[in-house]
């Protein structure tokens, strides 16, 4: 009977588990002066489209910074890696991003939680080509999520 390479089995299992783990994305936006109302319109449009078309988006919210009227924060919770890739490729999101660059000075994206290496590579390429700064805060493995809610 051949022996199993348990290290390799463990590595492959962790890839599957990582791709199916919920995580948080924060996008920090700074709108150009005089464009706040226009920006709020495109934010509302994309929010409605995401709600209708993305079941893997578990939470999607756009908040204003209390200390700066030009700054806003998207808070998004994704069911898994595939939900993020779907979001990036969703046509209404693409339209929003195009309009964003007309109405805003900047956007910076932060992700908190586990992501598969292939997902990080994909989003680094997509956001890098659009000059969108991205930072992945890797988990320390201290923390949890409730399977009953997310899976």
What would you call each of these model-derived segments?
Residues 1-72, 79-89, 103-151:
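Short S/T/G/P-rich N-terminal loop/turn motif that feeds into the first structured element of a domain
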Residues 93-98:
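A short, acidic, amphipathic alpha-helical segment used as a generic capping/interface helix at domain edges
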